[in-house]
UniProtKB/Swiss-Prot annotation:
Residues 764-777 have a biased composition (Low complexity). Keywords: Cell projection, Ciliopathy, Cilium, Cytoplasm, Cytoskeleton, Disease variant, Repeat, WD repeat. GO terms for cellular component: 9+0 non-motile cilium; centrosome; ciliary basal body; ciliary tip; cilium; cytoplasm; intraciliary transport particle B. Component of the IFT complex B, at least composed of IFT20, IFT22, IFT25, IFT27, IFT46, IFT52, TRAF3IP1/IFT54, IFT57, IFT74, IFT80, IFT81, and IFT88. Interacts with IFT88. Interacts with IFT57 and IFT70B. It is linked to Short-rib thoracic dysplasia 2 with or without polydactyly: A form of short-rib thoracic dysplasia, a group of autosomal recessive ciliopathies that are characterized by a constricted thoracic cage, short ribs, shortened tubular bones, and a 'trident' appearance of the acetabular roof. Polydactyly is variably present. Non-skeletal involvement can include cleft lip/palate as well as anomalies of major organs such as the brain, eye, heart, kidneys, liver, pancreas, intestines, and genitalia. Component of the intraflagellar transport (IFT) complex B, which is essential for the development and maintenance of motile and sensory cilia. The keyword Repeat applies. This is Intraflagellar transport protein 80 homolog.
Length: 777
């Protein structure tokens, strides 16, 4: 990725340009010390003077009023705030009319910023004051006051906090009066510029110590640049939070959100005092010290999938290369490319007006359809369809270009959605809520309606990243997520009215990815790279989960690595320095998944015998129990030395009825309640009581015996035997009440139990014989 710079031969301003801002992706306003506000039209390359300010007004900063979302195409900003050296800020219309001028600070007003909703304005000045104003310019409060000038300010993503500079310190102050203030030393020189991104919640700072730094919202350092030759005078996040730009003297740098540099350009600009990204995130404008406005387009982005490499060579052209045969295809578009995604044998490209869908089998005939709003900020792909975040809505389309659905939920903010907070599978869409980050909304892909009974998924901690598995049946769909404590959890998306258990898979997990062809999960856990070959094991037999993992040292990936993709048996990881590392894992677990999904159990056993690895046998054991194939489970458990489980499986095989077998398989997986329900529905009340006795669940055993008026003496007898074994006296009031005047006769009880077992056997054989009679012609 690099920047394509365009700079006019002669500057349009006579003095330094202090600030720039985009109205649409093709229109920019610039303000200069020559008192002019100039409009730039990039389509026609024309510049027009909007207004000439009075000679005593020197503009310092300006910010467009946030656009209203949800109207067709880009709704243009209609007014902006301009801060100036005379201590005032001015509310100015798009046509250049000064609507209002407000005395704000003693000395220059160094920065002014609207919040994301456009309901409040923050200004900072040389007098060290931070003030909050209403939309109409009425003073609401003085948020803070200090003895040094405040050079830069930024709103937090929720518009509830303000970040500002204080010499070498950065301060985050909430708008609530008594809330805790966060302050830390950020640079060795005066901090000149800050920016806070609403999508990734990361902070940028630039200072006179010639460094730029990246921080999280708690003030923890994520990246610290090498010192440059000159002070860093400007920094700005791209709207989607994936990139940021850095400006200095004769220097413009494009960086990844983790800090490493994609490209460095040395235009003849003087110091770049202000950087603004276009709404679609494809181009940058810089306010230059020599009167120029520098424009830079982001080009040469790369996308890779299997043997295909796609490169954005120009604003309207892409090159596709097949690395197997070196075949090259050129793709040309009518409009500027905004976003693209390559996955599942399809390339999806969005321009400012249309969406193109290419198949990797045929690059010549794409499916083309018009976009609703033309401001795509995210593309996600699954095997059968893809998702677009376009303007204020989410749209799901098939690869044939057919519209499928558009999920919605109350308070949905599409401007802050990214690949970490939205996940897509063939049947489900998952979106983490921004208002309450502990909640995940789940939708049916085919209808866009809430999944199942409409309940959202709720966790006890804030969720950072979510990912749906990609294969298997809808009823088995799982979602994995990382929470604020860096715990990796997994749960089922189908709730069936009951609260599904959220199970912790690992701790200190930084990044995760599901495989695209089978439900294998990988993640970076502290200093280890881990692959969960069969994450469903946690629902089947948690004891053998450690045996189903692959682990290796991850220290070679340095600090803060990120998993980019997990395609086939290859995992791609991006290190903190920007380099890509590819890891290959064994292909056998994927083959095992394939055999099991096709119920080829003999082939699965044969594969495990061929590979001779404990992880494979452990995966097969869990898969067999999950699919109720106890013969295969017995072989697999024997292979990993779990003899007690082999014996239990043998005892299940000898049970008389299929209901009893089913109940004991559920018990084997720890599903006690479900096992009891199966037995009670089949009328096997004694067996339901007996499993509670075996588990020492005395309260429930007595409750069932009393409810069904049977085997009360059996429960009391086993309870008495249990207490005698441990030399204890009965203290439970219910047991004391039912034991009054009841003589325990073990002979009678054993006869009753024998009768129950005989009855169950007869019932089972009669149902089987009736079935066989029914089958005869």
């Amino acid at each position: 990725m690099r920047l394509k710079i365009s700079l006019l031969k002669e500057p349009k301003h006579q003095e330094l340009v202090s600030c720039v801002g985009w109205t649409t992706a093709e229109e920019l306003y610039s303000c200069s010390d020559d008192h002019q506000i100039v409009k730039w039209n990039l389509l026609t390359s024309e510049t027009t003077q909007i207004v000439k300010l009075p000679d005593d007004i020197y503009p310092i900063d300006f910010h467009w009023f946030p656009k209203s979302l949800g109207v067709k195409k880009q709704t243009q900003a209609e007014s902006f705030v301009l801060t100036s050296s005379d201590g005032k800020f001015h509310l100015i219309s798009k046509l250049g009319r000064v609507e209002k001028s407000v005395e704000a600070h003693c000395g220059a007003v160094l920065a002014g910023r609207w919040n994301y909703e456009g309901t409040a304005l923050v200004t900072v000045g040389e007098d060290g004051q931070i003030k909050i104003w209403s939309k109409t310019g009425m003073l609401r409060s003085t948020l803070a006051q200090q003895g040094t000038p405040v050079y830069s300010v930024a709103w937090g993503p929720d518009s509830e906090k303000v970040l500002y500079t204080a010499g070498k310190q950065l301060i985050i102050k909430p708008l609530q009066p008594n809330a805790k203030v966060l302050q830390w030393k950020a640079h060795d020189g005066i901090i000149l510029k800050v920016d806070w991104n609403s999508v990734n919640d990361l902070i940028l700072s630039a200072g006179e110590d010639c460094k730029y730094k990246v921080w999280d919202s708690y003030g923890r350092p994520l990246y610290n640049s090498q010192p440059h030759e000159h002070p860093i005078t400007s920094v700005a996040w791209a709207p989607d939070g994936e990139l940021f730009a850095v400006g200095s003297f004769h220097t413009l740098r494009l960086c990844d959100k983790t800090g490493w540099s994609y490209a460095l350009e040395k235009p003849n600009t003087g110091s770049i005092f202000n950087i603004a990204w276009s709404i679609d995130g494809t181009q940058i404008a810089g306010a230059c010290g020599n009167g120029h406005v520098v424009f830079a387009h982001v080009v040469e982005q790369h996308w890779e999938w299997k043997n295909f490499q796609v490169t954005l060579t120009k604003r309207r052209a892409m090159q596709v290369r097949n690395v197997l045969n070196d075949a090259v295809d050129l793709l040309e578009f009518r409009d500027r490319v905004i976003k693209a995604s390559l996955n599942y044998a399809h390339l999806v490209v969005s321009t400012s007006l249309q969406c193109y869908v290419f198949s990797t089998k045929n690059w010549n005939t794409p499916i083309i359809f018009d976009l609703k709003e033309g401001t795509v900020s995210l593309i996600l792909q699954a095997e059968r369809h893809f998702l677009l975040v376009d303007g204020s809505s989410i749209y799901l389309y098939s690869y044939e270009g057919r519209f499928i659905s558009s999920p919605k939920f109350p308070g949905m903010r599409t401007d802050i959605l990214n690949a970490q907070t939205v996940s897509l599978s063939n049947d489900t869409i998952a979106i983490r809520d921004k208002a309450d980050e502990k909640i995940i909304f789940l939708f049916e892909a085919s209808t866009g309606k809430p999944l199942g009974d409409g309940k959202f998924l709720s966790h006890k901690n804030e969720i950072l990243e979510i990912a749906l598995d990609q294969k298997g049946l809808t009823n088995d769909r799982k979602i994995a997520f990382i929470d604020k404590n860096r715990d990796l959890c997994i749960t089922s998306v189908k709730r069936f009215g009951k609260e599904e258990q959220i199970i912790k898979l690992g701790t200190m997990v930084h990044t995760l990815a599901w495989n695209d062809t089978c439900n294998i999960l990988c993640g970076l856990q502290d200093t280890r790279f881990i692959v969960w070959y069969y994450p469903n094991t946690v629902y089947v037999d948690r004891d053998i989960l450690p045996k189903t993992l692959y682990e290796r040292d991850a220290s070679e990936f340095s600090k803060n690595p990120h998993i980019v993709s997990f395609v086939g048996n290859q995992v791609t990881i991006r290190r903190a320095d920007g380099s890509l590392v590819h890891i290959s894992i064994t292909p056998y677990p994927a083959i095992l998944h394939e055999y099991v999904s096709s119920s080829k159990w003999e082939d699965a056993v044969r594969l495990c015998r061929f590979v001779k690895e404990q992880t494979m046998w452990a995966c097969l054991a869990a898969m067999a129990v999950a699919n109720r194939d106890m013969t295969t489970a017995e072989i697999a458990y024997a292979a990993i030395g779990e003899i007690d489980k082999v014996q239990y499986i043998n005892s299940i095989k000898n049970l008389p009825s299929k209901e009893s077998k089913m109940a004991h398989i559920l018990l084997f997986s720890g599903n006690i309640q479900e096992a009891e329900i199966v037995l009670l529905q089949a009328g096997l009340v004694y067996q339901a009581i007996q499993i509670n006795i075996n588990l020492y669940n005395w309260e429930r055993a007595l409750e069932l015996a009393v409810k069904y008026k049977t085997h009360v003496d059996t429960v009391l007898a086993y309870r008495q035997k249990f207490l005698e074994t441990f030399g204890k006296q009965e203290t439970n009031k219910r047991y004391l009440h039912y034991a009054e005047g009841l003589q325990i006769d073990w002979e009678k009880i054993k006869a009753k139990i024998e009768m129950e077992i005989t009855k169950e056997r007869e019932q089972s054989s009669s149902s089987q014989s009736s079935k066989s009679i029914g089958l005869k012609p």
